[in-house]
Amino acid sequence: MAEWGIGVGTLGAMSSFRVDLRSDTVTKPSEAMRRAMAEAEVGDDWYDDDPTVNLLQERCAEAVGKEAGAFVPTGTMANQIGLRLHFSGPGHLVAAAAGLHVTSVEVMTAAALAGIAYRTVDAGPRGWIDAEQAAQLLEPDEFYDVEVIDLISVEDTVGGVGGRVMPLEELRAVRKVANDAGVPVHLDGARIFNAAAASGVDAAEIAAEVDTLMFCLSKGLGAPIGSVLCGPADMAREARRLKILYGGAWRQAGIVAAAGLIALEEGPKRLHEDHERARHLAEGVAEALPGSVDLEQVETNMVLVDTEALGMPMLEAIERLASLGVGVTHSGGKIRMVTHFDVDDTGIGVALDAWRRLAAEVVKKGETA
């Protein structure tokens, strides 16, 4: 019988992994989360009467200094509702850096569901659009230019370049350009709490520079599912309408919202541990394979590895690591590893042992060639 699904080969062979570094989305609920889920007070989110969902939305909005929040199943849905909120209909243009989640994974979603197109810029290894680039995009090329930018979208941390943090002063500069042009700013803050932990800047201070933002409960914070879109109270009704329109109105969603409350409360406190382990992992891989890791790029919980030094194709290296019990994936032509709630020091040791074995095999192959 045929099945609907996506075949990802070794990227999906989780049962064989001793340590799973593919993403911070692979975490299992903690015991506290499981208890909270079992005991959650629930209602029907479609009718807006699930008390646990409503409490989660309120606390998430408070955490980032916004007035209202909408709990939805995925980060993609949160972003798409957030973008759509700013437009009355289709036919709008959004400025953003190339390679962001919204301009890659979600690019066709925006086109199909909201009639939104993107004007992208090459942000290079930093990953974010800067104020000068934003100003250039907002300036019409000619008098009758129909390609008018209606919104600027940013991401923090920037996953495509290894979880780099957009400096607050850079975000403020982009916000000023947007304000001067009268256009809003939306933040894909899937890992905003990682950005806050790494920079020492409160998440609410980052969020103050944007009109709307979303963040994931199911990435670094460790919840099993869910993201929250946050913004001003006067957008809350329309956000709820779009949530229903996009199929995001849950039923007894308090069951998963209960885990989200624990993730929101406890998750940010321990993100620095993920960052420290990512640094240790990066330094170890760089030692085993000199030149394979740009340590200056390792700011949060991601490590990108250039496999050129291995002398084997990237996908072959991923399969070899999987055979050694280490789950990894790839991004931008490099192997990507992400530390998270379920990766401890022992797991980092397992990963480093695998990389050292890989490096030793390359040396041995070179000696016998």
Regions found by a protein language model. Give the residues of each.
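Conserved PLP-enzyme active-site core in the AAT-like
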Residues: 4-296, 300-324, 328-343, 351-369
